[in-house]
């Protein structure tokens, strides 16, 4: 198994992004990416870029493998706000999937405000989508 390589010396920093070189191959080394498949891959890549908050600095998409140079920002102090989380979820999920999460977050916030729960309620909802 290959060893992970760090491209930035500040990998453990809480205020600077980390940069990774990623490579993934198609199963059985088949030539799976034609013109349409490459365009579909680009679309999904950009969707997940918006969802994750990461930034694709560069990429090379070939017929049977992909290289990405990915910038991963540090997690915001205190994590994402509820609004920021819902905005990211809307980048990859249809409205019908995001509405129940918004409702669950609102209910958790109400319980916290009423003194019937702790911040852990909302944190657990956030961690389902933002765990690193």
Predicted segments with their positions:
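Short catalytic/metal-binding and nucleic-acid-binding patches
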Residues: 1-132
